[in-house]
Structures are given as structure tokens and as C-alpha cells.
Amino acid sequence: MKNKLPPFIEIYRALIATPSISATEEALDQSNADLITLLADWFKDLGFNVEVQPVPGTRNKFNMLASCGQGAGGLLLAGHTDTVPFDDGRWTRDPFTLTEHDGKLYGLGTADMKGFFAFILDALRDVDVTKLAKPLYILATADEETSMAGARYFAETTALRPDCAIIGEPTSLQPVRAHKGHISNAIRIQGQSGHSSDPARGVNAIELMHDAIGHILQLRDNLKERYHYDAFTVPYPTLNLGHIHGGDASNRICACCELHMDIRPLPGMTLNELNGLLNDALAPVSERWPGRLTVDELHPPIPGYECPPNHQLVEVVEKLLGAKTEVVNYCTEAPFIQTLCPTLVLGPGSINQAHQPDEYLETRFIKPTRELITQVIHHFCWH
């Protein structure tokens, strides 16, 4: 029953008070089960059917799909339930206590992005879901901040094909229709150790890596020359060498050297294409030194994403907001949801507050966000 739903600020408070940290380090990683239970109960109270989906390969993580209405198409509103870890020494407030001060709501996940679910629930108070002409879906995912396992698994397994989707990441209510992807690899070279007084008796992994880096930097130049997307502030794929380590003593021939690098591909560039380009770039080293060079993923890759600029979703949202869609450099779950239907990234709060101590969402977003959610539900589910 709708009258069982708590007030907006109490929903928000309960979401923030329920820890759901995602981390690659097991000691910091937390299940999102309690948060999923909260959301599931509230959407059931609103008359939605709720499905909770365990996500394989995670530490007790779940997706939730709440659905209402019959037929094909409809609207999907999506977001992730997890947050990043927090640095206790840098927060001046309790991260798990929603605190309002000077026009800001403070707490871990206020902007990125538990708050979006509070806005959805609050907007649905005034929607008679029994009269929907098309279905409305609410998706809450797991592990966006690490592997994006929840969105990946949902996209791989669902039969849903909504007309369109909105992911409520903090975009300051500016609609986003494209972003770059992210690929992070470890280049590892296995040499042969020996005493530095006789270099011919060993294979110096640092020297081989020096050769490999030269080819990687040539790839960086080729990416810049070959691929362009003028809407981005950096209108080409970037390649960064971020970390390198090799050897353990000045008088030993280095046996192992490891380089960590990332590529930020443009929308439309496939992961297979990028892997092929990297392997081709490193082929001269691999051919000269068989079996000594390997390339491994550091994290699951995220492809670039783009919603067709002429899609009805873009036209409707631009008209409602009086703002043109944008492109951004950070990554979201949009590439995976986009495999199901045209998708925009659009939500309250600023990305500048995400992953920061004393994270907050400005209260000025409350009214326009509620209005926007109501409007898109009416447009895509009532007509």
C-alpha cells in the first residue's frame, strides 16, 4: 500500500544507513542484500512484482527487478546499489547518517547513487500503476563500482526489451548519450635472471619492456591519428602507462617486469578490435622473444557507449529539460543496458561529488528530479 511508504527523506535516510560497499579487496567488500530487501519491500508496497537475482561470481550480491504493467516495450529506470569504500579520516560526518546542512544532503551514496531510488519511489506515490499502458521496470544492480557484474549479468540473462532506459547516475540533470569505455591491461615480461657482470647469460626483462613500450607508444599515436569523435573534449582514444615495476637489485639481471596501462576507447570501437590492435603492436617483441610476453586483463573491460542521437528518448528528454544531450569521459553501466534498448544516463547530483569525502547531493535537485521522473513515466508508459 502506498500509505505504507515512508516519507521521501526517510527513504533516503534508510538507504544511506544501509552499507553496501563494493571493493576488490575482500575485507572491504560488502553484500548488498539488506539494501535489496529494503527496495524490494517498498516496490512491493507500490504494487510492483519483484524479482531478486543472485549475481554469480560475487560475494553475496544481488540485482533487483521491479516491474508493473503488461505488454511489450515500456521504460526501464536503472541504477546501482553499491558505493565505493570511504576514508574515515577524511570524512567530517558519519558516512552512513543522512545529514542535511546548507542546502546539501550528506552521506555515502547520496549522489552516487542510492538517492536515485528515493526519487523514483517518491515520484511513484502519485502514479496509478494499475493504469499503465506500457510496463515500467526498475532495475537495481550490484557491483557497478568494481566489475559491473550486476549489469553485465542482467543484460546477458534477461529477455526484457524495453523501448528505452534511463540510468540515474549523477549528471546534474544534464542528459548524457555517450561515453568512452575503459580497458586496463597488465603487460608482463618474463626474462632470465643472472649476475650483472655477465649480461649474455641472462635475458633482461626491463630491456624487453623498453622495446615493448616503444611499440605501445606508437600504438598511442596511431589511435590518436586514426579515430576521432569531435563531441568529446579529448576527441580520440587515450592510452596511458600508469604503473611499472621490474627487478629487485642493481647487480642482478632483471627476470620480471610488469607494466599496467589503460585505453579509453571511443563509442563504436569493439573490444576485439582494441585487443587486436594491442596484440599487433606487441607482435615484434613476441616474435623476437617467444613465450616471454603476456597480456592480461586487470579488470573486466567496459566498451564505449552511444545512444542514437535521433532516438525518441533523446528528443523527449531534451524537450523536457530544455537541454541538449552531452558526452562524458567517465564510465557507467550504459554499454550493457544499451544492448537491451536505447539508453540515456541522467540523474540528480554532480559527478564531482562522487567518490569524494563528505559526498553530498544539493537539495535544489529534489523538485526537478521528481518532476522529470514523473514526466518520463507518463510519456513512455501512459501513451
Swiss-Prot record:
Coiled coil: none annotated. Gene3D superfamilies: 3.30.70.360, Zn peptidases. Binds 2 Zn(2+) or Co(2+) ions per subunit. It is found in: Cytoplasm. Pathway: Amino-acid biosynthesis; L-arginine biosynthesis; L-ornithine from N(2)-acetyl-L-ornithine (linear): step 1/1. GO terms for biological process: L-arginine biosynthetic process. CDD domains: M20_ArgE. It catalyses: N(2)-acetyl-L-ornithine + H2O = L-ornithine + acetate. GO terms for molecular function: acetylornithine deacetylase activity; zinc ion binding. The keyword Zinc applies. It is an enzyme of class 3 (hydrolase). Zn(2+) 2 binds at residues 112, 145, 355. The active site is at 82, 144. Zn(2+) 1 binds at residues 80, 112, 169. One of its GO terms (cellular component) is cytoplasm. Its cofactor is Zn(2+); Co(2+); glutathione. Keywords: Amino-acid biosynthesis, Arginine biosynthesis, Cobalt, Cytoplasm, Hydrolase, Metal-binding, Zinc. Its EC number is 3.5.1.16. Homodimer. Belongs to the peptidase M20A family. ArgE subfamily. PANTHER family: ACETYLORNITHINE DEACETYLASE. Catalyzes the hydrolysis of the amide bond of N(2)-acetylated L-amino acids. Cleaves the acetyl group from N-acetyl-L-ornithine to form L-ornithine, an intermediate in L-arginine biosynthesis pathway, and a branchpoint in the synthesis of polyamines. This is Acetylornithine deacetylase. It comes from Escherichia coli O45:K1 (strain S88 / ExPEC). The gene is argE.
